[in-house]
């Protein structure tokens, strides 16, 4: 009887060990797959705001942290694109705090000379059928920033047409596009100041 119990105990222990090992392996594989998918999605988003032919570094591994009012409250991430060893452009997280239904989160690509290379919305709560035209699945409005140059903070073209600028507003919704235009302009102006600061920026994940 005792031998039978001991035998069953050993069997259960082996089974438990195998199950634990298998679970750990599955979790590790799942984590790797999820991380890989997230990295792929991020790269696809970067390609929409920054032409891939502009740079040859692994931009996702060139991530830095900044606290800049021009990009919105709190700490933001930015990624530096390099050609050879020369910084040529940057992708920045930015926030338009004054959307109609709250903050609008953006990704803005820009060079260091005043040209916005692309913009995409990553999160918003704008009204369906009105403010949601900032999404590419609804409208191509957001693509109109690509190639636009900012000639300083007093460049009045960087406004919606209702305010005397060059960017269309939406029918029945001016607040949303105005907020995005202003946020992209601020981010583009900030990019013009960045190049001399790059060597001093903390890397993402770096301990303070």
Swiss-Prot record:
Record GO biological process: electron transport chain
GO molecular function, one term: electron transfer activity
Keywords carried by this UniProt record: Cell inner membrane, Cell membrane, Electron transport, Flavoprotein, FMN, Membrane, Phosphoprotein, Translocase, Transmembrane, Transmembrane helix, Transport
Modified sites of kind FMN phosphoryl threonine: 174
Subcellular location: Cell inner membrane
Topology class, membrane: Single-pass membrane protein
Chain segments annotated as transmembrane: 9-29
Cellular component annotations (GO), alphabetically ordered: plasma membrane
Pfam families: FMN_bind
Superkingdom: Bacteria
Protein EC: 7.-.-.-
Essential cofactor(s): FMN
NCBIfam families, sorted: PRK01908.1, rnfG
Summary of the function given for this chain in its UniProt record: Part of a membrane-bound complex that couples electron transfer with translocation of ions across the membrane.
Quaternary data: The complex is composed of six subunits: RnfA, RnfB, RnfC, RnfD, RnfE and RnfG.
Entry's family note: Belongs to the RnfG family.
Protein's name according to its UniProt entry: Ion-translocating oxidoreductase complex subunit G
Organism, scientific name: Cronobacter sakazakii (strain ATCC BAA-894) (Enterobacter sakazakii)
Encoding gene per record: rnfG
């Amino acid at each position: 009887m005792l031998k039978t119990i001991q035998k069953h105990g050993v069997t259960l222990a082996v089974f438990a060990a195998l199950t634990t090992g298998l679970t750990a392996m599955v979790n590790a594989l799942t984590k790797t797959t999820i991380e890989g998918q997230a990295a792929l999605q991020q790269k696809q988003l970067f390609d929409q705001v920054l032409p891939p032919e502009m740079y040859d570094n692994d931009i996702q591994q060139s991530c830095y942290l900044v606290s800049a009012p021009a990009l919105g409250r709190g700490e933001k991430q930015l990624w530096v694109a390099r050609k050879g060893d020369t910084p040529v452009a940057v992708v920045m997280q930015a926030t338009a705090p004054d959307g109609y239904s709250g903050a609008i989160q953006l990704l803005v690509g820009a060079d260091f000379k005043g040209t916005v290379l692309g913009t995409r919305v990553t999160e918003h709560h704008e009204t369906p059928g009105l403010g949601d035209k900032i999404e590419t699945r609804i409208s191509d409005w957001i693509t109109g920033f690509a190639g636009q140059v900012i000639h300083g903070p007093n460049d009045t073209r960087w406004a919606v047409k209702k305010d005397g600028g060059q960017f269309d507003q939406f029918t029945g919704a001016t607040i949303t596009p105005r907020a995005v235009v202003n946020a992209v302009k601020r981010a583009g102006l900030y990019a013009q100041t960045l190049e001399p600061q790059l060597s001093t920026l903390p890397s993402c994940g770096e301990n303070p």
